[in-house]
Amino acid sequence: MQNKIGQNMKDTILEKSKELFLRNGFKTVGMDDIAQALHISKKTIYQYFPSKEDLVKATLYYVYNLAFSKIAEISGKCETAIHEHFKIKESIDGILGKDFETSPCFFQLKKYYPELCYEFEKKRCKDVKNHIENNISEGIKQGIYRENLDKSFLAVQFIAGSDAIDLYEAFPEEIGKRISIKEHDDKFLEFYLRSIVTPKGLEIVENLIKKENEI
C-alpha cells in the first residue's frame, strides 16, 4: 500500500514536471515552481528525486516512454504504413501539447544538460531508426513504397530531417519566415513520403494530406 502511494506521488510529480518543462523549459522551471504548482513542499519532491537533474532526466524519459508506448500501440495496426506515419504524428502532437510549439525546453536541455541530452539522443535515434526501418519493410510489402530502398540510409535521413528545424538559425534572412514545429513536421513528412512511395502510395499520401487540410 505504501509503495503504491509513493508511486502515485512520483507519477504526479512527473506529470506536472512534464507540463511545466515542456511549456517553459528545463532550465526556466525550478523545483519551487513544481512544488508550488502541486501544493506540496520541495522536500517531498526531493524524497523522490534527489536533485533537479534527476528530475529532468526522469521527466525526459517519462515523456519519451509515453511517446514510444503510443508508437508501439499504433505500429502494425493501421490500414497502411503511410497511415501509420500520420497517426503517430497526430499522437505525438497530443502528448507534447500546443505549448511545445514555442517552448525552449530542448534548446535548454542541450545547453544546460549536455551529457543527459547526448545520452537521450543516442537512445532516441536508435529506437526511431528501428521503427522507421520496420515501417519501410511493411510499406514495401504493401506495395506502397518502392522496392530496393536503402532502409538504414532512409531511417537516418528521416531522423536528420525531422530535427532540421534547428538549422533555421543558420539562415538569418529566413528567421522572420520561420515555420512552426507542426508545419515543419507536416512538410517534412510529405517530402519524405513522396521520395519513397509508389504511384499507389502517392495516392494515399495525397488523400491523407487532403483530409488533414480539411480539418
Residue positions per predicted region:
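Helix-turn-helix
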Residues: 12, 16, 20-54, 58
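Short secondary-structure transition hinges
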Residues: 97, 101-134, 141-144, 149-153
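C-terminal peripheral helix-coil segments that are non-catalytic and often amphipathic
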Residues: 134-142, 175-215
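Short linear capping/connector segments at secondary-structure termini
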Residues: 105-113, 172-175, 207-211
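Hydrophobic alpha-helical connector segments
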Residues: 58, 72-101, 155-158, 182-185
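Short, basic, alpha-helical segments at the C-terminal edge of helix-turn-helix-like DNA-binding modules
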Residues: 60-68
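Membrane-embedded alpha-helical segments of multi-pass transporters/permeases
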Residues: 164-169
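N-terminal intrinsically disordered/low-complexity leader segments
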Residues: 1-8, 210-215
